Amino acid sequence: MAQTTRKSTIRKEKNSFTSGVVHIQSTFNNTIVTITNLTGDTISWASAGSSGFKGARKSTPFAAQTAAEKAALEALSTGMKTVEILVKGQGSGRETAIRAIEGAGFDIISIQDITSVPHNGCRPPKRRRV
């Protein structure tokens, strides 16, 4: 009978980071939370869509909170403790995503709003008539 041999697999070690940056991009339709280390390499990310919300529910504050908690739990498992928060956009999930990051157990160093403001750039979308 032939002997079966096991192939040795090389496991990739998870790097541990103590501090990082939380990028929260909040649009009118979705909220995307990306957690990176200080050099900008992505450690974890989550969005309202990847957290199981579809359609109009993606733009709710609860969906943003769920996405932020999901990304935070994955980053906490790498040993991250202190974060800076960069918020971009004017969607409804901005504040709740920040509260969810704070509630997950991170020490927040700073919160910055990096929303870009056009100097009369592109024409805005037309007004809705409902």
UniProtKB/Swiss-Prot annotation:
Keyword hit for Mitochondrion: no
GO cellular component: chloroplast; ribonucleoprotein complex; ribosome
Domain of life: Eukaryota
Disulfide bond sites: none
Record's subunit section: Part of the 30S ribosomal subunit.
Classification via InterPro entries: Ribosomal_uS11, Ribosomal_uS11_bac-type, Ribosomal_uS11_CS, Ribosomal_uS11_sf
The protein's name in its UniProt record: Small ribosomal subunit protein uS11c
Family of the protein in this entry: Belongs to the universal ribosomal protein uS11 family.
Record-level Gene Ontology MF annotations: rRNA binding; structural constituent of ribosome
Any single GO BP term: translation
SUPFAM superfamilies: Translational machinery components (SSF53137)
Subcellular location(s) per record: Plastid, Chloroplast
A Pfam family hit: Ribosomal_S11
Keyword line: Chloroplast, Plastid, Ribonucleoprotein, Ribosomal protein, RNA-binding, rRNA-binding
Originating species: Phaeodactylum tricornutum (strain CCAP 1055/1)
